[in-house]
Amino acid sequence: MKTTIDHIPPQKQRQLSKTLEILHEEFEDALKDATANFKKRGRILKIILFGSYAKATFVDEPFTSKGYRSDFDILVIVNNRKLTDLAEYWHKAEDRLIRDKEIELPVQFIVHSLREVNTSLKEGHHFFSDIRKEGIVLYELNDEPLAEPTQLEPSERLRMASIHFEKRFKVATNFALLSKQALRIDMMNEAAFLLHQSLEQAYSSVLLTLTNYAPASHNLKILRSFAEEQDRRLAEAFPREHHRERAAFNVINEAYVKARYSNHYKISTEALEWLGERTAVLLALVNVVCSDHVSALQQAADKTN
């Protein structure tokens, strides 16, 4: 795997260094005073930068009409699956990465155990194969390489992609319809929750169809970042140029929990209508992106028959 970040501008290299510092500090803090053996022995084995900043295809255009900026996408590999629980061990790191003023770019990170990553590679998951091929090691406890990836036959990739697309896209569409009905009868919080679920399923549809992987997360910012990394056309759905656009997305991102359980969650009819319109745009784009991918896999499978 690659180890140099020389292609990244110095200012962003400093932001990456700060990101590593925060991940290490907060993980160590989460494990201090631990009594369980797996916590005492808990270690970060590797931290890998992947996505556009690893591939040198990043975009940083915050002042254009779309306001698009590539995120830092990071894979943290730990030595025990129990340590991958974001709410238990990583929520403070997540919060600091959002609030730290030295880090201007959004940081989206996922955590997996070494066994999970190696198993995924052996099973031919394209998401992890791509990280192994294109990722940059920012930190490693030792230089033990990741497992060699298995290359799936085109027919098998086609089979899995088709199943994911058919199932997830239908669910995403249904949630959007239910959200619209809830809004029509002024069930605001229910409409927000259902729209969140539509977006979650839409982005997961892209990730599973194209890579056979989606993080176990309800955080729309993570799912959006990873999905847009697969196909930049998806960024057209949710512009970021204006504060009101970013604020609306933040409010719907909170809906998974707060729209159901918080007495203080509020979202306006105007925001929900705009978010519903943008979700419809996203669903149309997801349909195109996934259909294109399935068609390409079908052509590849036909050539091998």
List where the protein language model places each region:
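Short amphipathic alpha-helical segments
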Residues: 17, 45-47, 196
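A general structural signal for short secondary-structure junctions and capping/turn motifs
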Residues: 38-40, 249-250
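Terminal alpha-helical segments
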Residues: 7, 82-96, 101-305
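Metal-dependent nucleotidyltransferase catalytic core
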Residues: 2-34, 41, 58-121
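Charged interaction patches that mediate protein-protein contacts
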Residues: 15, 23, 43, 296-305
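Short gly/ser-rich loop at a beta-strand->alpha-helix junction or flexible surface loop bordering the NTP-binding
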Residues: 44-58
